[in-house]
From Swiss-Prot:
Pfam families: Amidase_3 (PF01520). GO terms for cellular component: outer membrane-bounded periplasmic space. To C.perfringens pIP404 ORF10. GO terms for molecular function: N-acetylmuramoyl-L-alanine amidase activity. This is Uncharacterized protein CPE1502. InterPro entries: MurNAc-LAA_cat, N-acetylmuramoyl_amidase_3. It comes from Clostridium perfringens (strain 13 / Type A). One of its GO terms (biological process) is peptidoglycan catabolic process.
Length: 337
């Protein structure tokens, strides 16, 4: 079955905030849901938009589901009713109206979540005003995992974890237990570990992976604050964007080349080298030649990340004014750590 899955809200149009943050937690749950639906053999479409206002967020999510002719739409949320609540409020699902496939899926989901976690079962409720339910042509279910401010809900959620929540939702759709693919012990971890060892940059804010280095782009996913990525070893004279690769948890593979913001308030590039013995400045060049035109420069004592050294030149990513660039530098003026 072709299933559209959406993580509710985004970090620009944030969701509920209580003991836990809805936007942060539903990103964990929806990724787990996608993982288990994929394992079960479903064709899963991630319809979670990037950072945008609430109306755009809702529109893009539904439109992508429609454009892909999805057969089921699932949206993951966390609820909130009070500033703080001592006790349990529970898990529930919302549908547009009674009597269709959406109600069947919604009941299976809420029952399985409650049974599998111990969360109070709030049942299936109707709401014909919610955008995701009234604008979708396929059966649609909005899942409220639990209440952000309810102490017992949060205790259970933290104890059980987002991976189990995603698994229980997927198994409710699948109508049978889903087992993770059996692979040699440690194989998947080693793939990710190998990638992480090759990274050279930390995201210090949430990033949109773009298909091109401009403000008009296709959003290819989500890179969250704190994630490690790899800036690619290629010449880049665009202080607004850098070419990178990131790890896609939902499919457990490296991404293809994408572009992200190169601004210093979005990225923190690792450094492994220092500029030395420079009297004035060291030119950043487009090619490995003294005849190359000048991209920019670095000064004595500046730090940068060197990707490789070839023919007496070091390819390095450096901070240029208000964004990072990658260029060739005369290697004898670069001291590796």
């Amino acid at each position: 079955m072709k299933i559209a899955v959406r993580g509710g809200h985004n970090f620009k149009a944030k969701g509920a905030l209580g003991i836990i943050d809805e936007t942060i937690e539903n990103r964990k749950v929806y990724k787990a849901l996608i993982k288990y639906l994929n394992i079960a053999g479903h064709n899963v479409i991630d319809v979670t938009p990037g950072e945008c206002d609430v109306n755009t967020d809702l529109y893009l999510g539904v439109q992508k589901a429609e454009d892909n002719n999805s057969e089921l739409f699932l949206s993951i949320h966390f609820d909130k009713a009070y500033d703080r609540y001592e006790g349990a409020l529970g898990t529930g699902t919302w549908i547009y109206g009674r009597g269709g496939k959406a109600e069947i899926y919604a009941k299976r989901i809420v029952d399985n979540l409650s049974k599998g976690t111990g969360l109070k079962n709030r049942g299936v409720k109707e709401n014909s005003k919610l955008y995701e339910l009234r604008k979708t042509s396929m059966p649609a279910v909005l899942v409220e995992v639990c209440f952000c401010e309810a102490t017992e809900d949060v205790r259970i959620y933290r104890e059980k974890g987002p991976d189990l929540i995603g698994k229980l939702i997927a198994e409710a759709i699948n109508e049978k237990e889903i087992e993770e693919n059996i692979k040699p012990e440690g194989q998947e971890d080693s793939l990710k570990e190998k990638f992480l060892k090759s990274t050279n940059t930390k995201a210090i804010a949430n990033l949109d992976p773009r298909d091109n280095p401009s403000s008009i782009y296709k959003d290819l996913g989500e890179i969250y604050k704190g994630e490690r990525i790899r800036v690619l070893p290629e010449i880049c004279d665009n202080k607004d964007y850098l070419p990178i690769i990131y790890w896609k948890d939902t499919t457990n593979i490296e991404s293809q080349k994408v572009w992200v913001s190169a601004k210093q308030n979005y990225l923190k590039i690792d450094t492994n080298a220092t500029v030395i013995n420079v009297v004035t400045e060291l030119d950043a060049r487009y090619i490995k030649s003294q005849r190359s035109s000048k991209m920019g420069y670095v000064k004595n004592g500046e730090r940068l990340y060197v990707h490789k050294i070839e023919s007496g030149y070091a390819l390095g990513t450096y901070f240029a004014s208000n964004g990072y660039k990658t260029a060739w530098f005369t290697a004898k003026y670069i001291s590796l750590d």
